[in-house]
């Protein structure tokens, strides 16, 4: 049985609370100071693991108490996860570091069906959570008091650059056949696909972080943690299978022209990387400022292709959440997803596949993305993402009724009387599409257009999309 850790977080009035401060996420104009106080439920004398499998945090946000449920992201790494760097004389050094007891979590806010969370507990609490449609960031304060943390809204992070940032993909979408939405409406977890992702860090990014490989590694792991959460909506699971840091020099010519860099990276992956490391998709993270407003570029509909199942990403922000969204966006192109248009809707202020980054952080894929992704998968049937290769040594026994989906679960079992979820297997019963959620009724997704959350004040209602159990936030909210 997983022991649950209860941490009570008390907000404290701080002399400089509300003033500007420089954090790892950037310059923040308004923030609250909190002090996490750990209260463990483990029996006296019990051996406490470094990072618990499941945790809860009680905290106050804007004066209101909330409970944050977190669960260790057990499928974050593949079974053969490796890390490679280069010695000063150019020798390739590859290791398989232990990642069983890692410190990356995902979760939700209690009593908020539209909430999400991605948190790193490696050195204090760092990450983000969504509460009542607002995105909050949390990270440790570098003070003599090591327990102090800052919590702040994403909107209070100063914009690093007012210039527009956008994806470099400019393909003519009208050349594609119309998508038949009806054919995609009955997807269940049995259709799930699995992507083993390999990330490469160029020499410029290595130098940007002063050669601190540990800092780069933590940043990458948290960004994949965020990506993994975003792709759950598409029934796609992501596992990080390897990281390579070009610590000595670049292995290709990384240049401001993104198309040329993407072409070179694809060739290198095909002729070098794939010969020594099995994986499904590779991304290059670079400190190079691509020409124009471009911050990322990928081939479209190319998943599993030796050269073209690739993307290049500019490390364009101090906020790992923003770079993670760019990584998720470019991977979406590899899966055949196009840029969103005005007719597409999603649960966030901005959709992940929007061609231009919005000042409102993108959190979800749109209904269009869902349909286009599975249209590509069903038509092209990319074989490399059929196999599930997650770490079996990190999977603990599922805990029924903990309101979190754990490794191997399709639904949270609860009690044997659940008509949608088999309590013995934690799998959906035959014919069931869902077991819980504001848009789940009698084990089926509610019809598109059904009101799932009434508006407050002058705001707008939220509606079910007909293809998921969650209640997506209306993109036209005030």
Swiss-Prot record:
GO biological process: apoptotic process; chemotaxis
Activity's dependence on pH: Optimum pH is 7.4 (strongest interaction with alpha-5/beta-1 (ITGAV/ITGB1)).
Renumbered ranges of motif Cell attachment site: 456-458
SUPFAM superfamilies for the chain: Blood coagulation inhibitor (disintegrin)
Binding site for Zn(2+): 329, 333, 339
GO molecular-function term, one example from the UniProt record: toxin activity
Compartment(s): Secreted
Cysteine disulfide links: 304-384, 344-368, 346-351, 411-426, 413-421, 420-443, 434-440, 439-464, 452-471
Annotated Disintegrin domain residues: 397-478
Record's signal peptide: 1-20
Misc. remarks from the entry: The disintegrin belongs to the medium disintegrin subfamily.
Name the record gives this protein: Zinc metalloproteinase/disintegrin
Organism: Bothrops jararaca (Jararaca)
């Amino acid at each position: 049985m997983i022991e649950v850790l209860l941490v009570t977080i008390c907000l404290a009035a701080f002399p400089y609370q509300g003033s500007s401060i420089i954090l790892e996420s950037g310059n923040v104009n308004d923030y609250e100071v909190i002090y996490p106080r750990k209260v463990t439920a483990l029996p006296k004398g019990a051996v406490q693991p470094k990072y618990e499998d499941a945790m809860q945090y009680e905290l106050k946000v804007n004066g209101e108490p909330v409970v944050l449920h977190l669960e260790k992201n057990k499928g974050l790494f593949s079974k053969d996860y490796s890390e490679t760097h280069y010695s000063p004389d150019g020798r390739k050094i590859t290791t398989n570091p232990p990642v069983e007891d890692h410190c990356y979590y995902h979760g939700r806010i209690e009593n908020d069906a539209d909430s999400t969370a991605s948190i790193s507990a490696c050195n204090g609490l760092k990450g983000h959570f969504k509460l009542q449609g607002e995105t909050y960031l949390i990270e440790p304060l570098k003070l003599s008091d090591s327990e102090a943390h800052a919590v702040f809204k994403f909107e209070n992070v100063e914009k690093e650059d007012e210039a527009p940032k956008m994806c470099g993909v400019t393909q003519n979408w009208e050349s594609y056949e119309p998508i038949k939405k009806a054919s995609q409406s009955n997807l269940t977890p049995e259709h799930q696909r699995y992507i083993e992702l390999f990330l490469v860090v160029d020499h410029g990014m290595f130098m940007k972080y002063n050669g601190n490989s540990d800092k780069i590694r933590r940043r990458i792991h948290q960004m994949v943690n965020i990506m993994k959460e975003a792709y759950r909506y598409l029934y796609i699971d992501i596992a990080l299978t390897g990281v390579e840091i070009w610590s000595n020099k670049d292995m290709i010519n990384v240049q401001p022209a993104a198309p040329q860099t993407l072409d070179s990276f694809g060739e290198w992956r095909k002729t070098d990387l794939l010969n020594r490391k099995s994986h499904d998709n590779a991304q290059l993270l670079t400190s190079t400022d691509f020409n124009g407003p471009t911050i990322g570029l990928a081939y479209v509909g190319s998943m599993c292709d030796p050269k073209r199942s690739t993307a290049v990403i500019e490390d364009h922000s101090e906020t790992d959440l923003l770079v993670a969204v760019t990584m998720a966006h470019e991977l979406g192109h590899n899966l055949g997803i196009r840029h969103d248009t005005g007719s597409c809707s999603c649960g966030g202020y901005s959709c992940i596949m929007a061609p231009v980054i919005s000042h409102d952080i993108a959190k979800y894929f749109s209904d269009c993305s869902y349909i286009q992704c599975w249209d590509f998968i069903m038509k092209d049937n990319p074989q490399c993402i059929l196999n599930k290769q997650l770490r079996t040594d990190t999977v603990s026994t599922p805990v029924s009724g903990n309101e979190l989906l754990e490794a191997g679960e399709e639904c949270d079992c609860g009690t044997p009387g659940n008509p949608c979820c088999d309590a013995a297997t934690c799998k959906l019963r035959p014919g069931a599409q869902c077991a819980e959620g504001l848009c789940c009724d009698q084990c089926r997704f509610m019809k598109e257009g059904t009101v799932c959350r009434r508006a407050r004040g002058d705001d707008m209602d939220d509606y079910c999309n007909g293809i998921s159990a969650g209640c997506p936030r209306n993109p036209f909210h005030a």
